[in-house]
Regions:
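A non-catalytic, helix-rich entry segment at domain boundaries
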Residues: 1-64, 162
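Short, well-ordered strand-loop elements centered on a beta-strand within folded domains, enriched
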Residues: 6-10, 59-60, 92-97, 138, ...
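Generic solvent-exposed, charged/amphipathic alpha-helical segments
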Residues: 39-46, 119-123, 127
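A short, local hydrophobic-aromatic micro-motif
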Residues: 57-59, 120, 135-137
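Non-catalytic protein-protein interaction segments used by genome-maintenance enzymes to assemble
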Residues: 60-120, 127-130
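Metal-dependent nuclease catalytic regions and adjoining charged, substrate-binding loops involved
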Residues: 74, 112, 124-167
Length: 167
């Protein structure tokens, strides 16, 4: 089963790469390194997803958002990429933003409102793009910890900060 999931992520990654202009040799080397690291991380990610979201299915990976911000008097758009959206059997969608770190998140990072606002905006515009009730969408940070002694993956829910202030 993990091999099927890894193939799915590899295929999605290849599709995204095909959209890029890789004339720059440095960029190509960086992408190869990114792919190598992703393959090392995958075996840590799947068990954590299975633990938190039994029976999940992948809705999208690296989903691009390019939505007009209609609440402002300016002609602005939000552009971003949602790392992972999964759907669980209860009909809920879960937006996961992966963050890499060496020793976990410091208290200041956990309390950084801009980091939380990013997920709030992703949720708002994801719901608008797909016409989904915001009550059916929850947001999370997936922490990919890499240290000299061990590697681990943790998923930290941001629901308490973002759902109360939905529009």
């Amino acid at each position: 089963e993990d091999a099927d999931r890894e193939d799915f992520f590899d295929e999605s990654f290849d599709q995204e790469l095909a959209k890029l202009d890789l004339d720059d040799e440095v960029q190509e080397v960086a992408l190869k390194e990114f792919r190598r690291n992703a393959r090392l991380i995958m075996p840590l990610v799947f068990p954590e997803l299975d633990k938190h979201f039994p029976g999940y299915e992948v809705f999208s990976t690296e989903e691009m958002l390019y939505q007009k911000i209609t609440e402002l008097n300016y002609d602005w758009n939000l552009k971003g990429f949602i790392d992972l959206v999964i759907k669980t059997p209860d009909g809920k969608y879960h937006i996961i933003d992966w963050k890499t770190c060496s020793w976990g998140w410091k208290r200041e990072k956990k309390q950084d409102k801009l980091v939380t606002y990013q997920l709030t905006l992703y949720k708002k515009f994801f719901c608008e793009k797909h016409d989904i009730d915001p009550k059916l969408v929850e947001t999370y940070f997936g922490l990919l910890k890499r240290t000299a002694k061990k590697e681990e993956t943790k998923i930290r829910e941001e629901k308490e900060r973002t759902s109360e202030k939905e529009t």
